[in-house]
């Protein structure tokens, strides 16, 4: 393992088994295109079948690879505009700098962030500064890795309050076929996950979480099976007897269909189950 993942990506393989391939209660459409000059367009829209609320977003991205620059423009149906400029591996190898800003014309709210990330063998370091009206906040994270073992720490410091408002710690072990991840958030929330790639077609995951002072433990298991190169089936269940099912099929190159359902195992005949439909086009 040359470079460890960022703190946010610790345990990502297990989370992906639980989250990818599902879209309960949503009808979703995604479109990705790329022009000849390298300009990338990504648009998405979704409708909530319960609230009938429709949301959408548009993103354009241009990479100036000669100078390690990436320019991104974003817009969503809440009428929030965003601009992101990233420069990577230019000032120093492994160093990534990002300026991220957003503006909402309806409310006049503005936000700006400066994100820095530095990675090299055995180390992944990040520091973000969020410039808020109430006062800047600083979020820092560090992950160390050695022979598959990982240890990470994340903190958030709010200058307006002059105190640390978040303190998280994680430990894990990672190989190509197996991953173990445990974390403690603010000394009160505990979690863990296990990821196992059984073979080329089957992936499994287990997660566990609980809060200090609360006897309610959250537990779930999930699996993803690659039926063939164009189709895969996903399933998951938790200790609340909620059963999730997902099926993804590549109809033709660039067109992908996703069907999903969330069933209440305690009230199978009572209704109230959620269905989802997703279409993804890529050209």
Curated annotation (Swiss-Prot):
Q: Where is the PTM Phosphothreonine found along the chain?
A: 19, 107
- What positions belong to coiled-coil segments? none
Topology of the protein relative to the lipid bilayer: Multi-pass membrane protein
GO CC annotation terms, alphabetical: membrane; membrane raft; mitochondrial outer membrane; mitochondrial permeability transition pore complex; plasma membrane
Q: List the residue(s) that the UniProt entry marks as the site Involved in ceramide and phosphatidylcholine binding. Critical for channel structural stability and gating.
A: 73
Q: Which Pfam families match?
A: Porin_3
Cystine pairings recorded for this chain: none
Keyword annotations for this protein? Acetylation, Apoptosis, ATP-binding, Cell membrane, Ion transport, Isopeptide bond, Lipid transport, Lipid-binding, Membrane, Mitochondrion, Mitochondrion outer membrane, NAD, Nucleotide-binding, Phosphoprotein, Porin, Transmembrane, Transmembrane beta strand, Transport, Ubl conjugation
Q: How is it modified after translation?
A: Phosphorylation at Ser-193 by NEK1 promotes the closed conformational state preventing excessive mitochondrial membrane permeability and subsequent apoptotic cell death after injury. Phosphorylation by the AKT-GSK3B axis stabilizes the protein probably by preventing ubiquitin-mediated proteasomal degradation. Ubiquitinated. Undergoes monoubiquitination and polyubiquitination by PRKN; monoubiquitination at Lys-274 inhibits apoptosis, whereas polyubiquitination leads to its degradation and promotes mitophagy. Deubiquitinated by USP30.
Q: Does the keyword Acetylation apply?
A: yes
Which PROSITE patterns has this protein been placed in?
EUKARYOTIC_PORIN
Query: Where can the Glycyl lysine isopeptide (Lys-Gly) (interchain with G-Cter in ubiquitin) cross-link be found?
Result: 12, 20, 53, 61, 109-110, 161, 266, 274
Name its cellular compartments.
Mitochondrion outer membrane; Cell membrane; Membrane raft
Q: Which reaction does it catalyse?
A: chloride(in) = chloride(out); K(+)(in) = K(+)(out); ATP(in) = ATP(out); Ca(2+)(in) = Ca(2+)(out)
Q: What residues does ATP bind to?
A: 12, 20
The PTM N6-succinyllysine maps to: 20
- Give the molecular function GO annotations: ATP binding; oxysterol binding; porin activity; voltage-gated channel activity; voltage-gated monoatomic anion channel activity; voltage-gated monoatomic ion channel activity
Residues where Phosphotyrosine occurs?
67
The UniProt comment on domains reads: Consists mainly of a membrane-spanning beta-barrel formed by 19 beta-strands. The helical N-terminus folds back into the pore opening and plays a role in voltage-gated channel activity.
Quaternary structure and partners? Homodimer and homotrimer; in response to cyclic AMP or calcium; oligomerization is required for scramblase activity. Component of the mitochondrial permeability transition pore complex (mPTPC), at least composed of SPG7, VDAC1 and PPIF. Interacts with SPG7, NIPSNAP2 and SLC25A30. Interacts with hexokinases including HK1. The HK1-VDAC1 complex interacts with ATF2. Interacts with BCL2L1. Interacts with BAK1. Interacts with RTL10/BOP (via BH3 domain). Interacts with amyloid-beta and APP; induces VDAC1 dephosphorylation. Interacts with TMEM41B. Interacts with BCAP31.
Q: What else is known?
A: Dicyclohexylcarbodiimide (DCCD) binding on Glu-73 inhibits hexokinase binding in vitro.
Function recorded in the entry: Non-selective voltage-gated ion channel that mediates the transport of anions and cations through the mitochondrion outer membrane and plasma membrane. The channel at the outer mitochondrial membrane allows diffusion of small hydrophilic molecules; in the plasma membrane it is involved in cell volume regulation and apoptosis. It adopts an open conformation at low or zero membrane potential and a closed conformation at potentials above 30-40 mV. The open state has a weak anion selectivity whereas the closed state is cation-selective. Catalyzes the scrambling of phospholipids across the outer mitochondrial membrane; the mechanism is unrelated to channel activity and is capable of translocating both anionic and zwitterionic phospholipids.
Question: This protein is called what?
Answer: Non-selective voltage-gated ion channel VDAC1
Q: What's the source species for this entry?
A: Sus scrofa
Q: Which gene encodes it?
A: VDAC1
